[in-house]
Structure formats: C-alpha cells, structure tokens
Amino acid sequence: MAIKKSMSLVSLGLTKTRGWLCLFVLCASAWSAAQSASKQQDKSQDQIGYKSAADAEQKKTLLLKDFQPVPMLHTPVHNVDRAKYYVIDVHNHVNDALGIDEHMPPERVIEIMNNTNVKTVVILTGMWGDKLQRVIDEMVKPYPGRFMVFAQIDWSKIDDPNFSQEMVAQLDDAVARGARGLKQLKDLGLTDRDKSGKLVAIDDPRIDPIWEECGRLGIPVSIHSTDPEAFFHPVDNTNERYEELIEHPDWSFYGPQFPSKESILAARDRMFAKHPHTTFVALHMANWPENLDYVSHLLDTLPNVMVEFGAREAELGRQPRRARDFFLKYQDRIMFGTDNGMDEAMYRNHFRWLETADEYFDYWGYPGQGRWKIYGMELPDTVLEKIYHKNAERIFGQFRGVANIK
C-alpha cells in the first residue's frame, strides 16, 4: 500500500514536471516566433527605405546635366495655339543687323506670326546706316505693318569731340530711313569705357542730347540695363543659374571689375527722370523681375517708363500670385515681348502662361535659366488685350509716318 502511494506521488510529480516543461517549450517557441517576426519586420523596413542604403553616398554621382526628372503631377493642360487677341511683340531680334538670332526666311517668319495671331514684331537691333537699311529692305518694306525696326548708337565714337551731335544726326538719318525707335544694349553702364578707361555711365551727360532727340522725334527708347540678379553673384553651388553661367561664363558680372547691379539701375533711373518727355521701355521687366517691389516703385515714380517681359517668363512665372497682382495693377504699363527668336511653340508657351491657370509647367527654354517650373496667371480679357497690343499701339502710335498696324 505504501509502495503504491509512493508510486502515485512520483507519477503525479512527473506529470507536473511534464506540464511545466510543455509550458516552457510553448513560451520559448512563442518568444522565438516573435523574435523572428521582429527581425523580418526590421528587414522589411530596411527594404522600403526607412534606413539609408549603405552605398547611398557612393551612388550620388549623377551629373547635374543628366538629371532630368519627370514630374508625377496629374494637372490640367490647356494649350493655346493662337493668342486670344492679336499680338504686338515689342522685343525680338529676328533677322536683325547684329545676327543675334539665326537668319530665317521672311516667309517663314510671317507664317509663324499668322499661325499664332502675332500681328507685328519689333526688331530691336537694327544698327544704323547701310546695315539698318538692309533690315528695312528685307523685313519692313515688303510686309507693311508687320515689322518695325529700331536703330542703335555707334558707341565707338564716344571719345569724338562732337559725339553728341554726330549721334543725333545718325539717329535722325535712321528715322528718315524708317527706324521707329532706339535700342540700347546692356553694355552701356556695364562694360563700355572711353579711351581713358572710365566706364561710360547711363546718365553720362554726353548722351543727354540723344535721349532728348528721341523725345523730340516722338520715338521710344528700349533699354536693356544689367542682367538677372544671379549674374552678379558668385558662380558656385548656391547660384540658382549655375548651369546657365558655366555654359556662358561671359554672362557673369561678379567681381570688382564690374559695377554693382544696383548702381547701374540707379544711374538708369536718374536718366529716366532727367528726360520726362522721352518714353522709355525698360526691357526685361526693368531687368529686376526678381524684385517686383522695385519695379513697382519705378513705375509709380516715373510715368514716362513702360516695361515688357522679354526672356523673363521664367522669373515671373514662378511667382504667379505676386506677378498676377502686379500685372493687374500695372496693366497699362506692360507690353508683350519675347526675346526668344521666332517659333510657334515659344509663342504658345507664353500664351499659356498669360491666359490659363495651368500649374507647374516648363517655361520656354527650360531648364536654361534655372531648375524651376512656372504657373499660369489666367489674366482677365481686358488686361490681356492691353498687354497683347493696346499698350504698344498707344506707345508706337507716337511714330510719325508709321503704318496703321490696326
């Protein structure tokens, strides 16, 4: 009996031991499974990018020129084949005397204009004398009302004792030949020097008679002064136009050998104020579209100044709300200009920017001026009509003997 009882107790002890052992095995299995799942999760997290790849730095060798990302945005696209109202392009160089753009058969130029509703193009760089005459004979005379040409000043004669009188006579001759305005390149105030080595400032008194003569003749002066703000900063990894400047190093005006952008514009603005009876077109949105507060002050202060946006679609298009407010406020002072050669797609890109509310699309020439996109302004019809042609007609209507472009 005692032996049986003892055996029962042993059996009971073994049973309990087996139970604890099973429980231990089950717990161990659960812990092992949890650890395995955790490791699997960590591995999964590594795979979907929660941790940097070990060779990430090694892979950062893609050249900037080869980086061409395709936006994944799904936004409406409204292509505008023809401008809503006919256009006067006040800033072009097609078939000019300087050869700024590649020469194009005049018939093809007219075809592009007809296809896009561009009525008249102003060829700014006509030079003077025989070179001016060639532009007039090729582009102006055969196509009445479709082209106008502006003359230029011969700055190589700046040191002549009678420079002012000679240039006034040259200007009078240009207008007699058919020139309808005067174009001034950015060299004045930036790189042009007299024989003493002194920089010729835009408000140099020797030039005053020329500006005054333009007022007397009733012709506007289209003037390009300075360049984008980034051109006056170091060409380094912080410059938003780095790619453009390494491709065109002569466009960089950073360094002690150049005057500051601000000083050049200040001289130009003093000149504007000194000649209130002459109409000036401050090209490229007064050459500070990055600073529309400055342009606003200029227009508020000087009623004899107009602006246009040639080659500055990129700058204005990336600040759509600010730019739209500006265009609405100064709708009587802004004219349509391109400064981008002659191309249907170029004009249509500008129309899309002005007429639609499309978002995040390429400016014309992207990424030449910088790696950003632009946004449409969807301007009201009354504003579009002024910018497309009415403002230009008001200014160019001052010309004597000009064909009725309406």
Question: Where are the regions that the model predicts?
Answer:
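Active-site gating/metal-coordination segments in enzymes
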Residues: K51-P71, H78, L132-W251
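H/E-rich (His + Asp/Glu) clusters that bind or coordinate divalent metals
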Residues: P256-Q257, K261-R270, K274-K406
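Active-site gating loops and adjacent loop-to-helix segments of metal-dependent hydrolytic enzymes
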Residues: D46-D66, K84, R193, E229-Q257, ...
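An N-terminally biased module of ancient metal coordination in phosphate/nucleic-acid-related enzymes
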Residues: A37-P142
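Bacterial N-terminal signal peptides that target proteins for export
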Residues: A2-L21
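Hydrophobic faces of well-ordered beta-strands that scaffold small-molecule active sites
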Residues: I88-N92, V121-I123, V149-A151, L182-K183, ...
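Acidic-and-aromatic substrate-binding clefts and catalytic sites of carbohydrate-active enzymes
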Residues: D96-M104, L124-Q133, S156-Q165, D192, ...
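Bacterial N-terminal signal peptides
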Residues: G19-A30
